[in-house]
A protein has these predicted regions:
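Short, solvent-exposed loop/beta-turn-alpha elements that line the ligand-binding surface or hinge
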Residues: 117-129, 211-232, 279-283, 295-304, ...
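Conserved C-terminal helix/tail region of periplasmic/extracytoplasmic solute-binding proteins
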Residues: 111, 163, 371-427
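Extracytoplasmic/periplasmic substrate-recognition and gating elements
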Residues: 243-245, 280-343
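Conserved N-terminal structural module of periplasmic/extracytoplasmic solute-binding proteins
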Residues: 2-105, 169, 282, 299-300, ...
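Hinge/lid segment of periplasmic solute-binding proteins
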Residues: 101-153, 177, 289-291
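A structural signal for short loop-to-beta-strand junctions that line the ligand-binding cleft
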Residues: 86, 93-94, 124-160, 189-190, ...
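Extracytoplasmic/periplasmic solute-binding protein
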Residues: 144-148, 153, 177-223
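Glycine-centered hinge/linker elements that transmit conformational signals in sensory
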Residues: 180, 220-248
Length: 427
């Protein structure tokens, strides 16, 4: 499932048809006083996760007397417009998924999303939420929403291809590039290149593994996209493309299918990609594996790992605020998170939850919990929305024309300068 989409907040017209659709999105006709024996509708931009949401809805019905039914979208601009339209109607979604970073700040500043500071405080005290995750859900000192999921970004690989050529997961960048060279020498495409919606993936990975301080500074306007460290990363990416290590960026085949069929040997992705693999009939440990991508710069004190966490939210004027809040409180507990993690084969925000059936991922989760990684927020959430929009287009253009890297960086920097000219750098 490719569940990120291009930012389009404010760019998609909220039509009367959408508004009419929103009018029927809630589970009730107004504020209800009942908090049991009801079913909440969870609107989300993760349509392929509907079976997993439905399973959790049955669990919650048994545990707390509140069921949950998913309403999934697969097109992000349409979904965002739909949710925004609900801010201006009398009918609201009971629960909805969103994104951290600039998008969460925007709806928090509109005062339409429920303040969950009390849930966070209790969750941290009870050991159901890690203190380190709180910062990504904080706007002006207050918390909003709770973690829908957490994912660690690494490399998924076809174990049959690795075995064929006697390859094992790398622990250094030199080993990583050696694997790519060996695969290429046998006519095997090493890496999935991503498409326009995911064009930031290789950029963030290379920069995080080379200059993590610059990576973080870009997100706060304290570094420039034309700084030497950033330019060097683009040159490195260009070299990988020119060496034939990447798949065709215009290939529309699902990356899970490409990995399964051997069209590519490796796919960089979040740990949630496990669900795609298993849905495609592949088994972790036998058909595919997962490893953390080594730093380019081996002198860095810790391996940089990209962290992704998406929010589960409710509105201040939800149809039944008490029921929605009760659901959010339940969601963060191990009673909810263990089946949620197990069903998708992914990590959980709850430290008490263990990953089952995937030794590779469980090792990564354990290492992350022990502080062995330098966890960095995914670029999609870290970059301000207007800068991200420009970057997605620029990185996509670069993949088609690698020699244009300087032009593309200048384009992104122009968007960054425009944004930070009206915002405080470091915010």
């Amino acid at each position: 499932m490719r569940h990120w989409r291009r930012l389009a907040l404010g760019a998609v017209a909220i039509t009367s048809a959408l508004s009419a659709a929103v009018a029927g999105c809630s589970s009730g006709n107004g504020h209800s006083t009942a908090t049991t024996n009801i079913t909440l509708k969870l609107y989300n931009d993760k349509g392929a996760w509907s079976p997993f949401f439905s399973q959790l809805g049955k669990v919650s019905k048994t545990d707390i007397g509140i069921g949950m039914s998913p309403v999934g979208y697969t097109d992000e601009p349409t979904y965002q417009a739909f949710i925004q339209a609900s801010f201006h109607t009398n009918r609201k979604p009971d629960l909805f998924t969103w994104q951290t970073g600039g998008l969460l700040a925007e709806i928090a500043n509109l005062h339409v999303v429920t303040n969950t500071s009390a849930i966070w405080q209790q969750g941290i005290a009870d050991g159901d939420l890690p203190k380190g995750l709180e910062q990504y859900y904080t706007v002006a000192g207050q918390q909003y929403c709770v973690p829908l999921n957490v994912a660690y970004w690494g490399m998924f690989y076809n174990k049959h291809i690795f075995a064929k050529y006697g390859l094992t997961p790398p622990t250094t960048w030199a080993q990583f590039m050696h694997i790519a060279q060996v695969l290429k020498s046998h006519g095997q495409t090493p890496f999935y290149e991503t498409d326009v919606l995911f064009s930031f993936v290789w950029f963030e990975q290379l920069l995080a593994g080379t200059a993590p301080d610059v990576y973080q500074a870009l997100a706060t306007g304290k570094a420039s996209y034309t700084d030497p460290a950033v330019v060097n990363v683009m040159k490195m990416w260009q070299g990988m493309i020119n060496d034939g290590y990447m798949s065709d960026p215009g290939n529309k085949t699902d990356p899970g299918v490409m990995l399964k069929t051997g069209e590519v040997a490796m796919v960089p992705d979040g740990s949630w990609f496990n669900a795609t693999m298993t849905q495609d009939g592949m088994k972790p440990g036998s058909d595919y594996g997962y490893f953390i991508i080594p730093n380019v710069d081996s002198s860095l004190p810790k391996t940089s790992v990209i962290l992704e966490s998406g929010p589960l939210c409710s509105l201040t004027n939800a149809p039944d605020p008490d029921a929605s809040t009760k659901y959010l409180k339940w969601w963060i507990t191990a009673a909810a998170q263990q089946p949620w993690s197990t069903s998708r084969g992914d990590a959980s925000a709850n430290p008490k939850v263990s990953v089952t059936g995937d030794t590779d991922l469980s090792t990564v989760v354990k290492n992350a919990g022990q502080g062995q990684y330098n966890l960095l927020l995914r670029y999609f959430e870290a970059a301000p929305p207007p800068v991200l929009t420009a970057a997605l287009d620029a990185f996509s253009a670069f993949m088609v024309s690698p020699g244009s890297y300087m032009k593309q960086l200048q384009t992104i920097q122009a968007a960054a300068q425009t944004y930070w000219s009206s915002h405080s750098a470091g915010s």
